[in-house]
Each structure stands twice: as structure tokens, then as C-alpha cells.
């Protein structure tokens, strides 16, 4: 695990509420080269009244405009993240319709020129979406490749951290015993290794590695191996 990732996890481990957590997100976004960030999450623990959290440091005028015009219904990042876990790079240049173009041009007038968005969700149905934005420069393909791992790691870590705060889940309710093989697979996953690479390192088949990772994901109540590694670290299991 890189020192950047370790520092991020350490910071999230000591936050006590959503506001403290978002301060860490803002600081991290700045280090990644973004002026603005936003995180939204909906918890399904109450079917009648699902809890929704919206945190951002966008200009106040844009926040007001966004709410008044109900832009959540036309915001392409929201529409994308409702149906996909894949990251989306956005700007007015990527607009597919005139409505989208108008939306992005207005956002640009408030300093939101280009950005990156990705959703996340877990097994209990908590959905989250992280957006990073800035007022200058396009996101080049080179920058996207260089920063992808960091931005993906931030998305998963934020979701795991804030879901724990909002849902107030006692993790002791779940089966948190991990076998040595499961821990080993998660440690190497945290180092950025693929299942095939882990298989070579520990001397088992790729299928066996995936078996251990799937078991870990179920025990830790997450839906991907990166989230499993993050949660295991945060819970002191590795």
C-alpha cells in the first residue's frame, strides 16, 4: 500500500462525523488537482425514509441554482452513476444533447469546467457518488491514467467511511473472522496486485485467489475487492 493510501486511511479512521470526513475529502481532492468535490449518499436502512447526505464545496450560487432548477434530473453525472459503477470524465465537450450542453455551459460559468465522477454501493444497498471538479484544464488521458488508482481508492474509502458513520452499523454483527489466506489475498490487493499476480506470489491458482476474495467480500459486506481491502484495513483485520 502506498503512503498516500495509508495517510488517507489513517485520516478517515479518526473522523467522528460527516463534516470532519468531508474536510479530509476536500484536502485530498486538492492534492489530486481539483478545486471542488462533492459526495452524495443514500442509505436504505429505512425504507420509508431513506437517509440522504449531500456534501460539497461548490460555489453557493451554483448550489442554489442547482436546487432551484432541479438539475439533479438532467445532471449527466447523476444519470450515469445511477446505472454504472464505471468512472465518468465530464465537461461541456462530452455533452450528448443540447440540454446537457446548456447544463455544462452554465456549470462552467460557476467555475466547474471539467471533472470526474464515480458511484459506489455495498451489499446492504447504500449508494454513494463522488465528484471531483476544477475550473481549469481538461482531464487529459495521461492524467486520467496516472490518477485513476488514487481517485478510485478515494471513492471506495470515502464510501466505506461515511457509510459506517451514517448507518451506525456495529460491524461485530457480521462474521469478521478472516482466514490467513483471505488476509493474504487482501493484503496483496491493497498493494494493487491483480488476482493473477497474487496467485503467482502465493503459489495457488487464480481461481483460488478469487474464491478467498469473494469470501472476504461477503464477510465484510462489500461488493468489490478494493472495498474489502479498505474495510479490512480500517477494522484492523490485516
From Swiss-Prot:
One of its GO terms (molecular function) is DNA binding. It comes from the Bacteria. Residues 195-214 bind DNA. Induction: Expression is decreased by virstatin. Residues 170-236 form the HTH luxR-type domain. SMART domains: HTH_LUXR. GO terms for biological process: quorum sensing; regulation of DNA-templated transcription. Disruption phenotype: Deletion mutant exhibits deficiency in biofilm formation and motility. The keyword Transcription applies. Pfam families: Autoind_bind, GerE. InterPro entries: Sig_transdc_resp-reg_C-effctor (IPR016032), TF_LuxR_autoind-bd_dom (IPR005143), TF_LuxR_autoind-bd_dom_sf (IPR036693), Tscrpt_reg_LuxR_C (IPR000792), WH-like_DNA-bd_sf (IPR036388). Keywords: Activator, DNA-binding, Quorum sensing, Transcription, Transcription regulation. Signal peptide: none annotated. Belongs to the autoinducer-regulated transcriptional regulatory protein family. Positively regulates the expression of anoI. Required for biofilm formation and motility. Probably part of a quorum-sensing system with AnoI. This is Transcriptional activator protein AnoR. It comes from Acinetobacter nosocomialis.
